[in-house]
C-alpha cells in the first residue's frame, strides 16, 4: 500500500496502541494478549494498530487486517532515545512487514552520535519504499524529520522531553501548527484520554 492510500485509510480514524512491557500486567512471555487487544480494537472500529516488538507485531498482523505502526522499545546507555533507536531494530521491523516504521524523532542524539534526521535519511537510503513515522515533541523536530524523509510525523513525544516538560495535556494548537508547517502527514498521538479529545 502506498503512502496516500494508507493515509486515506487511516485519516480521521482512531489508531489504537496495543503494547505491554515486561513489567506490565498484560505482558506474557509467550505473547497472545496483544493480538486479542488488536482484535477488540478492530471490532470497535479502529483504523490502525501501533505495536511494540517483532513478536507482538507478527501476531497482530496475523490476527487483524489493519495497518500496523511498528516500534521496538529498548534502552541504550548514554542516550534518552528508546523508540527504534538503531538500524538493527529497523531491519527487524522491515523484515516482519510493518506498514509504518516509527522511530524517535526528538533532538537527542543516538548512541552512534547521529541525529533523528540523519537516521531517517539512512533508513530511506536502505529501504526507500518503507513508510517511516517520526515520533516528535516540537515543531522544529517534526519539520527536520519530514525534510529528512519521514512520511508521517507523530506528536508522540510531546511532554516527554526536557524541552516539553509540563505539556501534560493534549495541545490542539500545537497539532494545528505542526500540520500547517510540517510537509509530512500528521498523526496526533499522546495525552488523548477521552473520545471527545479524539473526535476533535
PLM features per residue range, with description:
Residues 1-28, 61:
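N-terminal amphipathic alpha-helix/helix-capping segment at the start of soluble metabolic enzymes
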Residues 4-8, 39-42, 57-65, 116-128, ...:
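Surface-exposed amphipathic alpha-helices with a cationic face
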Residues 11-16, 64-78, 124-137, 179-190:
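Short beta-strand/loop segments at the ligand-binding rim of alpha/beta enzyme cores
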Residues 15, 48-50, 101-103, 133, ...:
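Conserved beta-strand positions in the central sheet of alpha/beta enzyme cores
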Residues 29, 78-96, 137-151, 184, ...:
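Catalytic cores of alpha/beta
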Residues 30-35, 82-88, 115-120, 167-176:
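Charged helix-capping and loop-helix junction motifs
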Residues 66-114:
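Glycine/small-residue-rich loop that forms an oxyanion/phosphate-binding "nest" at active or ligand-binding sites
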Residues 100-112, 146-174:
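Glycine/Thr-rich beta-alpha phosphate-binding loop at enzyme active sites
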Amino acid at each position: 500500500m502506498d503512502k496516500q492510500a494508507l493515509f486515506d485509510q487511516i485519516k480521521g480514524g482512531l489508531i489504537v496502541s496495543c503494547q505491554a512491557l515486561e513489567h506490565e500486567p498484560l505482558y506474557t512471555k509467550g505473547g497472545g494478549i496483544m493480538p486479542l487487544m488488536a482484535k477488540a480494537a478492530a471490532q470497535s472500529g479502529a483504523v490502525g494498530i501501533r505495536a511494540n516488538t517483532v513478536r507482538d507485531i507478527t501476531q497482530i498482523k496475523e490476527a487483524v487486517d489493519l495497518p500496523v505502526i511498528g516500534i521496538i522499545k529498548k534502552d541504550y546507555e548514554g542516550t534518552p532515545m528508546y523508540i527504534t533507536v538503531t538500524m538493527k531494530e529497523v531491519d527487524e521491523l522491515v523484515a516482519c512487514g510493518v506498514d509504518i516504521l516509527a522511530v524517535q524523532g526528538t533532538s537527542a542524539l543516538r548512541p552512534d552520535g547521529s541525529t533523528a534526521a540523519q537516521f531517517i535519511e539512512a533508513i530511506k537510503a536502505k529501504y526507500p519504499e518503507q513508510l517511516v513515522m517520526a515520533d516528535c515533541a516540537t515543531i522544529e523536530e517534526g519539520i527536520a524529520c519530514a525534510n529528512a524523509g519521514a512520511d508521517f510525523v507523530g506528536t508522540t513525544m510531546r511532554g516527554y522531553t526536557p524541552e516539553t516538560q509540563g505539556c501534560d495535556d493534549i495541545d490542539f494548537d500545537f497539532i494545528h501548527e505542526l500540520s500547517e508547517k510540517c510537509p509530512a502527514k500528521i498523526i496526533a498521538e499522546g495525552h488523548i484520554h477521552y473520545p471527545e479529545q479524539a473526535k476533535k
